[in-house]
């Protein structure tokens, strides 16, 4: 019995789903949510639009799934790099990880900007995400203040919001102009938050 080409080309559901998410990440990152259609994504994957809808019921659902996959990778990496590392070292490791994944970074930057509009499908997603990330970074700041690694006068919540703003802004600058050494600039900024002592034990500001 000879298999048809459609049977031979059929991929396991998990493999096909990942393929769709990879294509969607690039498409949404390059063109934004409204600049790309499900038909475009399906054609790039090599399946029909009904075939794509078998995995994701709508373009909105596909966008959120792509963002969730990106965050799953990001938060998993954060858990690894922050294990036993200082806030500064952990954030710099995360910066380098992001730089190694430009398609993922572009998806984040473009969609975050679009989601300012309340009607955007990712508006609620990004509001919740920023709350989660600010809380996580603030917790690391408090830990390092207790350990004497960061300046005690820093407000952890305000500093967490500031760090995220700096990192997000540097990512946009790097996407626009790769000659910007975003991780070097990030390190210079973060080192200003650290507690340093002179040879005679005085704290250096």
Question: Where does each model-flagged region fall?
Answer:
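N-terminal intrinsically disordered/low-complexity leader segments
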Residues: 1-15, 200-205
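Helix-turn-helix
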Residues: 2, 16-19, 23-65
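Solvent-exposed, amphipathic alpha-helical segments
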Residues: 23-30, 77, 107, 114, ...
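Conserved acidic functional residues
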Residues: 60, 71, 164-168
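Hydrophobic alpha-helical connector segments
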Residues: 65, 76-105, 156-163
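Amphipathic alpha-helical segments used for helix-helix packing
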Residues: 100-124
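Hydrophobic/aromatic-rich alpha-helical bundle segments in the mid-to-C-terminal region
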Residues: 119-131, 146-193, 200-205
């Amino acid at each position: 019995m000879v298999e048809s080409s459609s049977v031979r080309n059929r991929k396991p559901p998990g493999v096909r789903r990942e393929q769709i998410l990879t294509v969607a990440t690039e498409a949404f990152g390059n063109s934004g949510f409204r600049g790309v259609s499900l038909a475009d994504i399906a054609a790039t994957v090599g399946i029909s639009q009904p075939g794509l809808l078998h995995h994701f019921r709508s373009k909105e659902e596909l966008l959120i799934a792509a963002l969730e996959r990106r965050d799953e990778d990001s938060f998993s990496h954060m858990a690894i790099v922050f294990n036993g590392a200082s806030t500064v070292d952990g954030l710099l490791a995360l910066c380098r990880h992001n730089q190694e994944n430009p398609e993922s970074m572009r998806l984040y930057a473009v969609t975050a900007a679009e989601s300012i509009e309340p009607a955007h499908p990712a508006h609620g997603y990004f509001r919740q995400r920023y709350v989660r990330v600010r809380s996580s970074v603030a917790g690391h700041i408090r830990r390092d203040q207790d350990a004497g690694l960061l300046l005690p006068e820093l407000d952890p919540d305000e500093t967490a919001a500031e760090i995220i703003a700096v990192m997000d802004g540097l990512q946009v600058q790097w996407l626009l102009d790769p000659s910007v050494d975003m991780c070097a600039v990030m390190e210079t900024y973060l080192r200003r938050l650290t507690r340093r002592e002179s040879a005679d034990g005085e704290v250096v500001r």
